[in-house]
Structure formats: C-alpha cells, structure tokens
C-alpha cells in the first residue's frame, strides 16, 4: 500500500464515527398519536402535530415517523387533548364496585376528585359501623381508616382513572363530635385541627364542605376558618357546597369569601348556581361578587355541571333539625304524628334560615325520585313526587316523609332548579371548570337498580358537543382548558392537565363532529359518543371507543404531602 492509499484509509476510518454521529438512530416510543389537532390545555390555538408517549409520560410533540413507535394511532380529523378532570366526583363507592369507571372514561375523564363534605376518611369504628348499615346496592368491606389509606386501597384494587380527594369537614366533625347539633369545645376543635393536619400531610387536597346538609349545617363559620387555617399551611384549598344556592345565595358567597380571606386559603365553589326560579335573577350579582373578590386579590374559582337539574336526597326537602342525631333520629321523628305536623308546616313556609329544596323546585312534579334502598320501593324509580303522591292518595309532603321513613334512606332525588340562560352565563367564565356531582356508572349490574342523574354519563361531553360545537358558547380550545389545564392548576396537581413534554400521559382523542351526550332523565344509563381513545398514565384505557379493561389509575396527592 502506497502512502497516498494509506492516508486515504486513515482519513476514512477517522471520519466513520462522525458520519454515524450525524444520523443517530430514531428515538423509539410506545405510542405515537399522529396527525391530530392538538389542544394543549392552555387555551391557546391548536396545531396539527404528533404526540409521543413513552412509559407514563409525554415524550414529545413534533413530527414523528410511524417507524418510531410500537403503536401508531391515526388521529387525522380528530382532536387530541389532555385528559379531563372531574372536580366533583361521587365515585367513592362505585369504584369499589367497578374500577373501570366506564361512564367517566367514555367522556374523557382521567382524574376524579372526591370529598364534597364527606370523605372516605378519617373513620372511627362508630362511623364504619354506620357506613356498613347505610350501604345500598353496592356492598363492600371497609379496609381503611384514613383518607390516604382509602385512596391507596383504590389504587391497589385497580381503577382506570386517577383519584384524589379533599378531606371532608363533615367527616372531621363526625369523627370528633358525632351527628348532633352542637358546637365543639376548645379541646374538640383542636382534635379536629389535628385530624386535618394528619390528612393534609398524607396528601389531601384541602378541606371540602357541603353546608346545606346536616350535620355540616351545624358548623359555624369560625369552625370552618380554623380547619382551613391548618389546610392553608400545606398549600391546600377550601372547596364548598355553600350554605345556600338560593334565597341566601349572596350571603353564602360572603361567608366563603370571609373563610378564604381569614384563613388565607384559595377557595372554590362547588356546582355554582342560582337555584329556584325566584333566585334566577341573582346570577349576575353572584358572578360580579366573585369577580370583585378576585380583583381584590382573593383566589376564588368555581366548578359546575351542564344541566338545569340538581341531584341530592329527598331529605333535602326537610328542615336540618330533623337530622339532629343522624338518620335513625330522623326516621323516628318521621313516624311521630305531632313531629310530622311540625315538619310539614316548616316545609310549606318560605324561609331564609335553611335551604328548602321542596319550595325551590316550585312543584312536586319537578322532584324526580331516582334511587331507593328498599326493593319494595324500587318500582317507584323514575317517578315524580307528584306521581307517587297521586298513586298513594296523599299530600306530596306527607308522601316524601313516608318514603324516607319506609326506605330508611335519604332517597336519591333530582330537582329541577336552574335556568338554561344562567348555565350559559356561567359556562363562559374562564375561572369555572366542571364537575359531574355523580358517581361513575355503567349500564350493567348493580348500577341498573337505580336511575342516576344523566350528568353521570354526559356532563363533560355536553361541554364539547352542546355548548361548543352546536351552540358555540365556547371555542374548543376554551372548553378543553376548562376541562383540563384550569382544574389541574387550581388543584396544584403535579405534571397533569397539559399536553407538554414531561407531563404524565393522560391523553384523550375524540371526534369534535360527533362527540356528545345521549343520557336523558328518562333513560340515563347511556354512554357518551365520540370519544375514540383515552390514555391514563400512558396506558390505553379506551381503544376505538371500547374499554380495554386496563386499570392504570393512581392516587394523586395534594401539594402539602410529606
């Protein structure tokens, strides 16, 4: 070999590694969602781009080749968005029955937030015994004591959605005081504060209240402020079903603002509304009061459901003193003729001292009975209180008292209380997110033994279909922000709510042209349509509109967790 040939060989050998470095092997991903219109959860305009998933994280947003992925999803013509967050879930028991969370997943919900007043911990033996006694169609063992133990139980049991919870102020009160109408002693209040501290350090999101219901109704504002001061130290939030959504709506907002200010804690209003036709004209003042507080520096937000009917118990027709001492005391009172006459007189009398949903509905034909504990009464499911009263030949109020006593439960009930005009006024507000105020459901098994509110199947897709595509109340980027990025930010959820590199891969793919709700008040057990694919922590839970059976959901924790 001459010198020139030797020199050429040495040069080629030296350059070989550089040539290889110029073209590194293509990065590999578990999933690439190709060609979809990507809405990142910020509210910014969408863009057509690919989304790559590796493990439980979003690995990148750019143009990838199909060869780079084990699985490729063709999303051309479809919307790709962060998974939705249900700010008010009552799936506390339904997830034990069926961890697949079918109705939620088929709407694109990937995280369920619990804890409206009552939470699944902390519990003592007395509370556990009562919970077992009060169980309806869903039966389960209580294998936990604290709220964090319950969330870990769900995770180990297997759930398709992520789960997180506020600690219920009612649960804290019940643990220490019981169900009686009395105020805590200084020692009891300190015990309540200590329970809050332990749950916040274990990962609770903050304090949740439901102040129209006994025994929460018995708590004074000062008690709530003291509990919230503890939660605030752990960057928690106060979230409330306020003391009134009707006659005393504006005063109830004042109470929430006072708690937020004095405890130095962000506050959120559950299912914001002006309930009862005489109060519909308060919606503008309600929204203005909140926005004035925001301008003054308070961190106030809200959530809502997308229907004009509320759902709670038939016992919400009765004055709160009837439940002093709990349900056994209520049932005893309802069987006493003299006490019944007193109750009936109070139900018929307009008042500002308690939230009377019988009068707020305006008529017993706007009170729909949706779920009974007793097999004997289940045939009445789906009938109005007016219909049942006529069947029995009795006054509607007497009928309501009879039914509660016979069923020995609060009886699931739907009340038609709100105006569509106000729903639209609320839905456009950039600080309002969404919560179903329902349990996850499925059109099978124990779930078919009662009629849920249709919001269990349709709350979130109704935002995308009815209010965005059809009525154009929102743009799609606005709607998706309110379903994902906004609640994730409000809750301080770590690396959730946005489609960005490094975020957890909670991702939904849906057809904007067909997405929508099918559930009705007459036939609520009907899945939403238009949701194509759903990923939770990188695992595919919905594929081509069908549940895969995967249960990759995790317990999520508040920012104060130690």
Q: What do the predicted segments below correspond to?
A:
Residues 8-17:
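Bacterial N-terminal signal peptides
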Residues 23-29, 38, 42-83, 98, ...:
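Histidine-rich, glycine-flanked metal-binding segment
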Residues 36, 336, 425-431, 437, ...:
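C-terminal cap of metal-dependent C-N hydrolases
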Residues 38-50, 411-418, 422-423, 471-481, ...:
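Acidic, glycine-enriched loop/beta-strand segments at the rims
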Residues 75-80, 84-85, 89, 95-206, ...:
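Divalent-metal coordination cores built from histidine and acidic residues
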Residues 198-255:
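Divalent metal-binding pocket/active-site signature
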